[in-house]
């Protein structure tokens, strides 16, 4: 009887995780398509997404144990990339050099976040950085309520990447954020200067000036909405980088200095 109850509970939990994994890949494209109706609807949809993100960040940590947020990150990247490749590039206004630089930055972003996840998965579950909860925590360990593991040298848990960030993978997290910022900055600028009326800022660098006509054609509207969504991501990443600069980067440098100092002794 007890085994049947446990199996039933496990089945319900697995179904919930499957649903949480799939929903972002359906919900985000739907929201982006709805946002193409008009500028007012675009602002409403983007505000809705932003308020949803703020709500998630304000919830107790143990309630964020879901693959939904990681799937949202993946679906965001995939949607914006597909719009860029199938929408923006099809207008044939972006040079090969600009596209090459964009792809290099994107590859750097993917590599850094892949390494961050791979190191976290190995160190926490197969290596020495994670272990089952102990009532007595050591000075360099912290119990993660989401991973449900005691994590050594932990900085924080990223629900958007579904892993703990600690000393071995922190540099990949930081570099991934820098690459992601550069990728989105270039991608949104290329997209907006392609679909809007651009103006020369300096040399060959252009910025969008007039985007009033984008809602008259679906392809243009979808590209514009995706760029607005990308700008929202840019602002979030900028805040993340500022937080790293003032809080976690000094801590990381201090840890590295301490380790190398002890090693030299």
Regions found by a protein language model. Give the residues of each.
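Short, flexible, mixed-charge glycine/proline-rich loop motifs
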Residues: 131-139, 148-152
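Secretory pathway export signals and precursors
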Residues: 140-143, 160, 207
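Hydrophobic alpha-helical transmembrane segments that serve as membrane anchors
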Residues: 1-128, 168-265
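Short, non-ligating residues that shape and space the ligands of small metal-coordination modules
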Residues: 153-156, 167-170
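Short cysteine-rich clusters marking metal-coordination/redox-active sites
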Residues: 132, 144-147, 158, 164
């Amino acid at each position: 009887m007890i085994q049947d109850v446990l199996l039933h509970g496990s089945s319900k939990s697995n179904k919930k995780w499957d649903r949480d994994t799939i929903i972002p890949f359906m919900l985000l494209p739907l929201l982006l398509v709805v946002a193409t109706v008009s500028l007012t609807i675009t602002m409403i949809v983007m505000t809705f997404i932003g308020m949803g993100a703020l709500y998630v960040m304000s919830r107790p940590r143990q309630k964020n144990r879901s693959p939904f947020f990681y799937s949202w990150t993946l679906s965001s990247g995939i949607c914006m990339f597909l719009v860029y490749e199938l929408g923006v590039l099809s207008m044939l206004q972006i040079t090969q050099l600009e596209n090459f630089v964009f792809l290099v930055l994107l590859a750097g972003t993917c590599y850094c976040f892949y390494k961050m996840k791979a190191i976290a998965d190995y160190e926490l579950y197969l290596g020495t950085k994670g272990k089952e909860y102990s009532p007595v925590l050591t000075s360099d360990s912290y119990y993660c309520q989401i991973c449900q593991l005691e994590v050594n040298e932990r900085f924080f848990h990223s629900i958007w990447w579904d892993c703990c960030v600690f000393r071995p993978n922190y540099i990949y997290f930081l570099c991934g954020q820098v690459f992601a910022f550069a990728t989105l900055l270039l991608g949104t600028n290329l997209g907006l200067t392609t679909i809007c009326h651009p103006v020369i800022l300096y040399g060959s660098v252009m910025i969008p000036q007039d985007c009033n006509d984008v809602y008259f054609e679906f392809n243009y509207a979808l590209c514009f909405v995706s760029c607005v969504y990308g700008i929202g991501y840019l602002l979030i990443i900028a805040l993340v980088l500022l937080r790293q600069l003032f809080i976690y980067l000094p801590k990381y440098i201090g840890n590295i200095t301490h380790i190398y100092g002890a090693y030299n002794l």
